[in-house]
Amino acid sequence: MKQKIGLFILYYLRFFAKLQLKKNKNCKIIGITGSAGKSSTRNAIYSVLKNKYLVKASFKANSESGISLDILGLEMNNYSILDWLRVLILAPLRLLTYFKKFDYYIVEMGIDSPNPPKNMDFLLSIVQPKMAVFLNANLNHSFAFDQLVADTDPVLRKDKLVKAIAKEKAKLILSLPKNGFAFLNFDDANVKETCQETKGLVYSFGSNNLCDLQITKHQTQ
């Protein structure tokens, strides 16, 4: 029963979030995925665009519930039952009261599982980016992917787990339209592979001098 209620809430919020997005029908959505670096990338893109365009960014919202809430301009306070009731009541009202305009929506798209609603397919049912950034894939949030790998050898298991995670994240890139743009980290072999499958135009970045954007120096903070 608890699971059914949870799914109802997600579908409910998604319904109103998609209606809300239609108010900005000319908005270009930029999706960002990867096991690490999503927030930094979001901040960098936001800094570049904000002085010339109206930009909305999904701060602290990259999940199956967080993205819908962010689109509706709603935030959870303490995730109590009363808090959920509050956002459920406010969601339809936002269609009448929330008219924020933006040219770009930068959204982090984090996945924890190959299964809905915590997978990329569900996030893509909320937003359909025209531009996407795929940063990397590693074992962060890998628990739900364990069932996909039968190998017990630690090295083989790790490699296959990372590939399974990358495959799920890559759905963002594969969903792009022909007039879409994919920005791929060619330093990550699993990310680089997706360039052969996407319909969109690919721009590469990385340390190799053959990349469209070569990174020659970086600083870790």
Each model region followed by its residue ranges:
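N-terminal pre-Walker A segment at the start of P-loop NTPase domains
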Residues: 1-16
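Walker A (P-loop) phosphate-binding motif
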Residues: 14-65, 77, 154-155
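Acidic, Mg2+-coordinating active-site environments of NTP-dependent enzymes
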Residues: 25-27, 101-102, 106, 124-221
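Short, well-ordered alpha-helices that flank and scaffold nucleotide-derived cofactor binding pockets
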Residues: 46-51, 69-72, 125, 196
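Conserved NTP-binding/hydrolysis module of P-loop NTPases
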Residues: 70-80
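Conserved alpha-helical scaffold flanking the Walker A/P-loop in AAA+ ATPase domains
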Residues: 88-98
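Switch II (G3) loop of P-loop NTPases
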Residues: 103-117
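Conserved ATPase-coupling elements of RecA-like P-loop NTPase cores
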Residues: 114-120, 143-146
